[in-house]
């Protein structure tokens, strides 16, 4: 057992994201499985569509963080560029982060 997160494969690490106001949190496994959603009580006064959009935006960021880390692992192992071209990139992650930052 190690305390070094880099020693754990990206697919097995946990990634989390939250809204700027910290009212919605989502935790995702690097493989993409959602591990948890946390909603702070004040967010429950918002319309359901806003809450759903916040959950989706958080899940997207957490998922993409894991996928970008996984892609980096593949690149380090010498995977050919065309073999991982379908995987999300840092640019995809930044677009998701920008969308999340735009939420209230």
PLM feature spans:
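Short, acidic, Ser/Thr-enriched surface-loop or helix-capping motifs
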Residues: 29
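Acidic, negatively charged sequence signal
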Residues: 1-25, 33-38, 42-104
């Amino acid at each position: 057992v190690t305390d070094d997160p880099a020693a754990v494969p990206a697919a097995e690490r946990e990634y989390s994201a939250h809204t700027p106001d910290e009212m919605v949190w989502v935790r995702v496994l690097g493989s993409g499985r959602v591990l948890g959603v946390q909603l702070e009580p004040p967010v429950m006064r918002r319309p359901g569509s806003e809450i759903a959009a916040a959950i989706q935006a958080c899940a997207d960021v957490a998922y993409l963080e894991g996928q970008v880390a996984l892609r980096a692992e593949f690149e380090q192992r010498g995977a050919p560029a065309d073999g991982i071209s379908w995987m999300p990139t840092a640019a995809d992650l930044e677009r998701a982060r920008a969308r999340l930052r735009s939420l209230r």
